[in-house]
């Protein structure tokens, strides 16, 4: 059964607690791409290099990677509601402080604290929505994925609209919206039951002992380097006004959401997960090569088009991570995300460095190579990945309490 069909009738008839959590989730996902359109403005305003400003992504995702070992540990002990509120409080404080920064070092540090808050919130939000939603898990998952897609698409747009006046305003805007989310969840959401078993800090690491899960994580590590070269380095290459850059990444986010939620599951049913993933990685490699060597118009088109391939890849990778081993889904996903988010931290740092050492084209060559390396891992390790992957009935990528960053 298509989860969209199952959930369509009941998705809008939800308790206030669900809408409060879903609304805060939109803002949380907006925080990932919020800085894209204003990266050049931040560099100019703080007299910083592209490499220094790109550390906004590096600090954010480095903390996110490490937090994957902590979120399950925390939520299984203090409960979902308190974990959400703790995460929101971190975001409100550190996003607000980011807007007051006078140096790029301060901004990078505050962005790291923001990343911890976002990890705590987003890794818990789906489980809370499923627990509180009316109409079953299908309706809850559809609502959550809609919030995810809306946030990923609107983050760059909000960054552009507020950032056109000052690069500081998007940070203040995020803090304000998350403060509203904090109040809504405080008022409307009751405490959720705690898990029967508490998660240890080492459970995600132990889960990586499974060959299939480790293979999925390594392949996703290479792919994420490509993904975040596009997300963090391309704004400097395009060198557009915040409005124009925001429009480009809004279109990118729309394609990402549509292909992740609507297109990828249908392609999987027709061709199989591994074939879809391998083909999409090769196409992404070709896309970033053209992005790096084409003219300005080609770079814009390829940036937007990459959202389609990224959306497909995110969905398939997450389902592999959830289904290839016998570890509990939150534990398997935490281990998988722990590995792959290190690439999301590395790409924004190394892409500008590679440009300094060579020229503006080579970072995209490296990104194309890493996408192909991801495809090679899928090919070489297909037996370990096929054990369950090809028999999996495609399900929504976010059907898990820790996988949300996958999209």
Question: Can you name each region flagged by the protein language model?
Answer:
Residues 110-150:
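Cytoplasmic helix-loop-helix junction between adjacent transmembrane helices
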Residues 135, 142-186:
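Helix-loop-helix hairpin linking two adjacent transmembrane segments in secondary transporters
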Residues 47, 79, 100-106, 134, ...:
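Helix-breaking motifs and short loop linkers at transmembrane-helix boundaries and internal kinks
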Residues 68-79, 259-272, 355:
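Helix-to-loop junctions at the C-terminal end of transmembrane segments
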């Amino acid at each position: 059964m298509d989860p969209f069909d199952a959930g369509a009738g009941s998705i809008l008839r939800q308790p206030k607690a669900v809408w409060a959590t879903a609304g805060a989730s939109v803002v949380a996902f907006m925080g990932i791409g919020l800085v894209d359109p204003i990266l050049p403005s931040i560099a100019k305003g703080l007299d910083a290099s592209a490499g220094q400003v790109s550390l906004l992504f590096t600090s954010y995702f480095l903390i996110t990677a490490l937090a994957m070992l902590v979120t399950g540990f925390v939520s299984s002990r203090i409960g979902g509601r308190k974990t959400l509120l703790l995460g929101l409080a971190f975001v409100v404080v550190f996003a607000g402080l980011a807007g007051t920064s006078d140096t790029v070092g301060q901004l990078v540090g505050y962005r790291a604290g923001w990343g911890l808050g976002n990890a705590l919130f987003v890794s818990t939000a789906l489980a809370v929505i499923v627990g509180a939603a009316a109409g079953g898990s299908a309706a809850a998952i559809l609502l959550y994925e809609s919030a995810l897609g809306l946030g990923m698409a609107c983050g760059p747009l909000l960054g552009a609209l507020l950032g056109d006046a000052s690069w500081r305003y998007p940070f203040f805007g995020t803090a304000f919206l998350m403060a509203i989310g904090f109040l809504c969840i405080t008022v409307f959401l009751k405490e959720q039951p705690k898990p029967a078993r508490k998660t240890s800090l080492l459970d995600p690491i132990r889960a990586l002992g499974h060959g299939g899960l480790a293979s999925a994580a390594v392949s996703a590590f290479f792919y994420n380097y490509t993904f975040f070269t596009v997300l963090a380095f391309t704004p400097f290459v395009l060198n557009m006004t915040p409005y124009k850059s925001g429009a480009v990444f809004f279109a990118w986010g729309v394609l990402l959401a549509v292909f992740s939620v609507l297109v990828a599951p249908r392609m999987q049913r027709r061709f199989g997960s591994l074939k879809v993933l391998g083909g999409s990685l090769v196409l992404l490699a070709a896309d970033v090569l053209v992005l790096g060597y084409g003219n300005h118009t080609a770079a814009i088109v390829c940036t937007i088009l990459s959202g389609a391939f990224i959306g497909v890849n995110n969905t398939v990778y997450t389902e592999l991570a959830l289904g290839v081993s016998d570890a509990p889904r939150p534990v398997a996903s935490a281990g998988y995300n722990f590995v792959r988010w290190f690439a999301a931290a590395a790409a924004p740092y190394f892409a500008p460095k590679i440009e300094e050492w060579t020229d503006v084209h080579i970072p995209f060559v490296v990104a194309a190579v890493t996408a192909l390396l991801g495809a090679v891992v899928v090919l070489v390790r297909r037996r370990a990945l096929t054990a369950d992957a090809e028999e999996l009935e495609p399900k929504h990528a976010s059907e898990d309490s820790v996988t949300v960053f996958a999209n």
